[in-house]
């Protein structure tokens, strides 16, 4: 179920503080966050945010078409190694 328009987009307060500080200082260093649930706002465009995927921080460069999505969508948590090969098909 989608979030109500009346409530507006959700973004953690500590992440907003870090983004505002980075924008004010024009700092290009990645902003490290564990907040995968935060919505990407227009203020984030042009910044690199390191989103935690459970094991490490994945750097995500925010572009204009990412606005409205969640940060966690761009830092995958699972790695698919592929299915086991069928030995009969190799012959």
Curated annotation (Swiss-Prot):
Family of the protein in this entry: Belongs to the universal ribosomal protein uS19 family.
The protein's name in its UniProt record: Small ribosomal subunit protein uS19
Gene Ontology biological-process entries: ribosomal small subunit assembly; translation
InterPro entries: Ribosomal_uS19 (IPR002222), Ribosomal_uS19_bac-type (IPR005732), Ribosomal_uS19_CS (IPR020934), Ribosomal_uS19_SF (IPR023575)
PROSITE patterns per record: RIBOSOMAL_S19
Lineage: Bacteria, Pseudomonadati, Pseudomonadota, Betaproteobacteria, Burkholderiales
GO-annotated molecular function: rRNA binding; structural constituent of ribosome
Pfam families listed in its UniProt record: Ribosomal_S19
Originating gene: rpsS
